[in-house]
């Protein structure tokens, strides 16, 4: 259901927004990515030291490294009976495709609004934060109330499924004698979901997004040696 909501949102942005511009920037993005992938992967900015690699590249590497064990166990659990090809296409292929579509269309629309002088997106992001920017961008679309409702519902479902997946994996690990075809008790999953929620709220209240970023980097450190040994 949440996947359909995602495609509905992307269709609204594509059709109601500058369609030709969004298609052009999507194609252009692929070219830029292919052209700069190796350089950006090894870019540490030693001369200017602007802080971009640390704040974005390394942070997202650490984010996904910390995320990998939990999601790997979850995908392995729900992929029972499927071939490796199906798992790779489903997890990596369609996952990357969805991320690419969202960043190209949603990000491209924000760039269009900024470039056309319709919205001071960078100013809103700097002074008021991401949540205000999302609301301001949605307000530029037709039927903003409906689009905002769809966005809110989709976001809640995505968050809920992520928490449920994490709670499922943690509950499975903490349940002794659990066989491959068995599931942990629901109350165990509920406890872990609540614990994860409290941790997220606590980190957000303690220092905002910067604290979350720091914890992501710290959490990834123990996993890095395991990934190296697996390779």
Name the predicted role of every residue range:
Residues 1, 6-8, 61-73, 183-201, ...:
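Transmembrane alpha-helical segments of multi-pass small-molecule transport proteins
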Residues 4-14, 98-108, 150-174, 192-199, ...:
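Hydrophobic alpha-helical segments of multi-pass membrane transport proteins
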Residues 203-218:
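Extracellular/periplasmic helix-loop-helix junctions in multi-pass membrane proteins
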Residues 21-24, 28, 73, 82, ...:
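Short helix-terminus and kink motifs of transmembrane alpha helices
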Residues 2, 90-95, 189-192, 215-218:
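Alpha-helical transmembrane segments of multi-pass membrane proteins, especially transporters
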